[in-house]
Amino acid sequence: MDKLKKPILTEKSISLLEKRQYTFELDKNITKSEAKKMIETHFQVKVIHMNSYYLPINKKIRKNIGKLKRKKRMIFTLKVGDSIPFSSINMN
């Protein structure tokens, strides 16, 4: 679970919950097959579809001028009847 960083709770991701789609931030080196196995074993659900994307790189302006780390997110679509309760998500 160290490669699965945290669930994403934005306005868009909350609206996707109605379609059984869950958004997570992941380690940038993880593959789709590794992420699918991790979600299925940890939450005991069946993943039927996945989309991955990187957030755009932003520049720091305050103390140091440079680029922030690139972040990878994945949207997992679950089988009908499956869900991930947010009370079971512990990212510590």
Curated annotation (Swiss-Prot):
Domain of life from the UniProt record: Eukaryota
GO cellular component, one term: chloroplast
Cystine pairings recorded for this chain: none
UniProt keywords, alphabetically: Chloroplast, Plastid, Ribonucleoprotein, Ribosomal protein, RNA-binding, rRNA-binding
Annotated GO MF terms: rRNA binding; structural constituent of ribosome
InterPro entries: Nucleotide-bd_a/b_plait_sf, Ribosomal_uL23-like, Ribosomal_uL23/eL15/eS24_sf
Pfam families with a match to the protein in the record: Ribosomal_L23
Compartment annotation: Plastid, Chloroplast
GO biological process, one term: translation
Oligomeric form and interacting partners: Part of the 50S ribosomal subunit.
Similarity remark: Belongs to the universal ribosomal protein uL23 family.
Function: Binds to 23S rRNA.
Name of the protein described by the UniProt record: Large ribosomal subunit protein uL23c
Organism whose genome encodes this protein: Chara vulgaris (Common stonewort)
